[in-house]
């Protein structure tokens, strides 16, 4: 029996999500290290939140900032790529190809509404809407 589930995962301990411009200007070893951190975050959040295995999923991705400049809407793609790899590692999806990732929608970044909203200086918020396997 399959159904639709939705999970909101908030990574607020790694600081500002890595942007495309930042990754472009980093040494390739630094990019690899950064992606591993986001990958581990996706893995841990999936396990802690008990996200089940899914046959496929759609993703809404949004960055939240306490202060500082607001990047382009899709600038956080490098952070999300690592995060998505972590979801695959956790067994949420069998892979990150188009066969399993139905869509990725980047929502405009926003400033914090209150100091209680997140623990860190910034957060990557990933909403997963998926069909359970």
Feature names for model-found ranges:
Residues 1-133:
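Catalytic phosphate/metal-binding cores of nucleic-acid and nucleotide-processing enzymes, i.e., regions
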